[in-house]
């Protein structure tokens, strides 16, 4: 509701035709968590994904769930992507990455020219400094945050004390997600654009956003065990997960993939949500923890959640049968 109220205020303030409300959006697992795009589209708004991977999935329309936090379309081949782009944009591009990238870029730039609203997530928020930090390679977030209204939606788990902490998290995520020490861009936003170049008088609304709004999302996080909120979103756990590499994004919850997504779903939804997300798929091998930059004990969390699920009667039918056989026959068979 807060998100919609902010957008409606901007529509009225800028006298935007309600039949042509374009919103420039960057990649955000938090926005996926609350189905922000679907919700806004149901209000008649046109969402334009600016991240290349997200835009490809948006054009795909069906069976378009992301498979990695930083590489949402990494499961698609260049042949798949060429077919998606050619069909959705009525083009005849060759099966080559560069012409596909250029076609999507020109299409996105043309659409977001019509927008005065940008929405994004963030990598971290410096509570004491009053600033948010975003890391990206494509430069698309710079376009999103230059709109008249820039709305940032973030879970309360993104809060850290200082800007220095934000930078450390951004560097750590980049290293474990891409193997590089830094992304191409690190954006820090601490308010609307402004200048003091004329007699040192502070004037707002120069080139960037005229208004910046930050929405902090709880959605069950306050009740979660603290280890569930350590995640920095690098995706290294799913790359090294034997289960995820077999079943894909069926193992996880919404945009939170793998065992960590299963664990978090207990608090974002409920015990049954964690079972439906793959609570019993996990092998408890611990590869996720071993490859996690912050050593989130995901396998231990899942083991504890299984105990809770068992107490609530949320066992798999096969497990119930084994248990009953042991009780009645003294054997699982």
Regions flagged by a language model, labelled:
Residues 1, 17, 176-186, 241-253, ...:
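Flexible, glycine/charged-enriched surface loops at secondary-structure junctions
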Residues 1-223:
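The feature marks the mature, well-folded catalytic cores of soluble enzymes
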Residues 6, 10, 39, 43, ...:
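Generic, well-ordered alpha-helical scaffold segments in large soluble proteins
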Residues 32-33, 237, 288:
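Residues at the N-terminus of the alpha-helix immediately C-terminal to the conserved SAM/SAH-binding loop
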Residues 130, 241, 333:
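Conserved hydrophobic/aromatic pocket- or pore-lining residues that grip, position, or stack substrates
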Residues 204-228, 244-331:
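Ferredoxin-type iron-sulfur electron-transfer modules in oxidoreductases and energy-metabolism complexes
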Residues 234:
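Catalytic adenosine-cofactor/nucleotide-binding cores of aminoacyl-tRNA synthetases and other
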